[in-house]
Amino acid sequence: MKQEIDFIKFNPTQNMTVLVKTNHPAETYPHIAAQIMSYDNVYAEQVGFIAGAIKPEAAAHLEMAGGEFCGNACMALAAYIASENELKSTDFTEIILEVSGTDQLIRCQVKQQHNQYFCQVTMPLPEQIEQRTVKYEGIDMDIVIVRYREFIHIIIEVEAFDETMRKRAQALARLLGLTLGDKLIGILLYNAQSEELAPLIFVPQLDSLIWERGCGSGTASVGAYLAWSRQKEIVQHIKQPGGAIKVMAEWNGAELERITIEGSVGIVAQGKAFIDA
């Protein structure tokens, strides 16, 4: 028997994102997401579910299929709400969201630009940033751990995105998925010279391991790391396979004060998906 799913598909920096409009029990989210993400269905890198917000100041609640936090999905939902409200103003409109993976309300500034929506999102601040040298697969590896409440990013500076490093990153992501209780593990390969990022995102609950074409939260973590290591404000366009995402990390002299990412979102499809119930 087939089940109908109402969905919208978005393109935030080619990090193809599907948001589900119909209501479903939370325990069915991984099952629905796995089918929607597959090549023979709607096909996407991630799936989120739109629900009513609990807090009165929030316009909606976004629950990612694996309970993770996702910056690009926040942009996508803000763009959708703006489109539903027929936002035509050239000025920014603020949309506040409740989002899985963080207890902070997420503030999104949105304005329409041609056939897309330009979004600025204030991101959750990391709880801890630390630099370590770990022995992995027989070599000493310098890593930066950027820890949030329910997810963790590991930044590894590289000179090239070669196949050996990619395979090592994939094995490390799965290992951390087994040993840590986080809802999301990101391995972020970063080339400081070219300001390029190759983001690998693992969501253990979905067993989803994807080299994303653009990663908003990964971009925020790179900005946080650069501000922390240089002890100063950072404004940088982080190049990724799907395009660049701008990050602004404010440093107050002692700690990170605020992180914002900017990017464009296109609404590329809307309709019904049919999945096995």
Regions found by a protein language model. Name each.
Residues Q116-L125:
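Membrane helix-loop-helix hairpins that form the core translocation module of multi-pass transporters
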Residues L125-V144, E163-L172:
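Active-site glycine-rich loop that binds ribose-phosphate moieties when present
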Residues M1-Y117, R147, I152-A277:
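A glycine-rich beta-to-alpha transition motif near the start of alpha/beta enzyme domains, typified by
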